[in-house]
Amino acid sequence: MTQSEPVVEIVTEADAWQPDPRWRPAARLTVLLGEDDHWQRRPRYHEIVRRARDAGLAGASVWRGMEGYGVTSRIHTTRLLDLAENLPIMVMIVDDAELLREFVSGNAELFDTGTVALSAVQVWSSGAGSRP
């Protein structure tokens, strides 16, 4: 008669995680601009936010950076008064990936400068005020 060896199950933290239905897949559109980027004499970031709202996207936010550089490799910073110009601007919009792709395609003239990135994210939906 042979003795069977005990079965040992190794469970890692990742394996033990149970999906929470309040998390749902979404996408994040990130647009990196310079503060001096304009669209028809208005800040380009303002026009992007206005059109995102008009398109019914879930929400948009704009951040002004402290320091950064772009394609010209010139550093723009708030640390020195004489260089505190054309600071980096980041526009972020989170919604369904296909809606964001359609938004960029339908407003391509707004995205001819800067960097546009689309990333997969998870959005917490607590229920109150959440989109379906």
Predicted regions mapped to residue ranges:
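Positively charged, small/polar-rich N-terminal and surface patches that mediate targeting and assembly
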Residues: 1-132
